[in-house]
Amino acid sequence: MPTLYVILSLLLGLIGGVLVQRAIGSRQQAVTDDRLQREAQAEAQQIRAEAQRHARELHEAAEQDRQDAISKTQDAARRVQDAAERDTLAAAHEARLDEQREQVRALRAQLEAEREQAKADAAQQREALSTDRQETRREREDLGREIERLGRRTEQLDARSDKLDALEERLEGGWREVQRQEQEVAERLRQADLKLYEVAGLTPEVAREQILGRLNAELEEEKAIRVKAMTEKAGAEARRSARSIIAQAIQRSASETSAQLSVSVVPIPSDAMKGRLIGREGRNIRAFESLTGVDLIIDDTPEAVILSSFNPLRREVARHVLDALVADGRIHPTRIEEMVHKAQDDMKTFIHQQGEEAAIEAGVVGLKPGLVQLLGRMYFRTSYSQNVLKHSVQVAHLTGIMADELGLDAALARRAGLMHDVGKSIDREIEGTHVEIGINLARRFGEPAEVIDAIAHHHDPENGETLYSVLVAAADAISAARPGARREALESYVRRLEQLEQIAVAFPGVQQAYAIQAGREVRVIVQPEKVTDAQATLLARDIAGRVEQDMEYPGQVQVTVVRESRAVGVAR
């Protein structure tokens, strides 16, 4: 804008100069050229000065207008900036207010949730307190019953003590009677000596030997009769007490008699699935069998396939894999391998759960995790079709009951009963008998000496160092001998009976042998003219030893030798 004013001023000055020149030319005739020229120059300078002044004024005015415009623009920009800053501050303040409002709402919701949680916790605590009160009440009732039982037990012990005192008094009386009889015999011997010296004319040494020989024979017979009577009486009382304890233990214990087979039948949605399980050129079934170690039998059975394996653990893993493959629908070697690894991991968790449940059911606490895992493995182990883990739990119950009746540590007895067959959990993976493996495992996990002794001698309790091995052996026999607890194939059962009879008949002097009571007893008839009563006892022990050495059988086999003498007389 100021530049435009300058240009206009210059144009006006030029126009004025041109006009002046023209005026000067028209007036040349009236004045001289010099004067006119000077006047024209003076006037031109005046006009130029006026134009320059006017231009300067216009420039100054334009500059002032520019400065005013810049100032107004800056003021407007400042006002706009201030307004924008105020809007920004207001927006930030509003955002902070919104954020604070959200925080307040969140805090209020959190407080409400905490209040609800506190109410729920209070209700749970009240319920837990009520449960604890009920548990305490039941414990008090159990304690009362236990006190009553202990009172009855104390009364029984007192009665037994009285009987023992009476028996001791009778024994003392019998001993005094024996001493009196010995004195009488001594007196009779002295009198007999005198008579023998007088009548027979024997020397004192010879007479003394004859009398002592006769007297020793009489005393030996009398002592044998008394010892036999006392032994029979003590044995009868011991058998009666043992029967009572075992009967109580059996009455208070009950368990399932189910058994596992060596095959599992897995249902499938349709027979078309069988072809997918086999796969192209049999690659799926080969991958399945190689990864699981289980035979997959696909036959004409409608909507079902069969898994066959002697190892129940592998068979269970294979069943889980097959169920997952059928449900998923994607069946190929890679997917089969993934499912096998997943099923094996799941099976480890399942095994640990089974071990924990067995320990809880048996009332045994404080087992180390590795030992619990080994217990869980026995869930998939069978002995004569009897589940070893269920058998161990039942042995633990029976051992605890009998130990309680005998005044022993019931908790320690249950622990020994539960652990007695722990070696069977890995006896197919490690060399050695399940007894040897169980002893090593118990020592490795720091089990008490009583538990180790029970594991070592639950098949030969007569060599055990503690009573717990005897109780575990008895409970083991009770659990195995229950009807339906164990079973075997008919062919092997008949073969075992025949082998029992053949072993017994092979001994000299045996006339006949019969396997009775489902093979748990062999009755041997001997020839009385070839086998004496003393030899019959030795023969029974020898036959039992040969059976233990040559045969495998569940439980125990009793050998009974029968010797019968017949005397026939004919009256004519």
Swiss-Prot record:
From start to end residue, where is composition biased (Basic and acidic residues)? 110-119, 129-142
Q: Top enzyme class of this protein?
A: hydrolase
Subcellular location(s) per record: Cell membrane
A single GO molecular function term of this UniProt record? RNA binding
Q: Where are the transmembrane segments?
A: 1-21
Its placement in the membrane is given as: Single-pass membrane protein
Ranges for region Disordered: 59-85, 110-142
Q: Which family does it belong to?
A: Belongs to the RNase Y family.
Q: By what name is this protein known?
A: Ribonuclease Y
Provenance organism: Deinococcus radiodurans (strain ATCC 13939 / DSM 20539 / JCM 16871 / CCUG 27074 / LMG 4051 / NBRC 15346 / NCIMB 9279 / VKM B-1422 / R1)
The organism that produces this protein has a lineage beginning with: Bacteria, Thermotogati, Deinococcota, Deinococci, Deinococcales
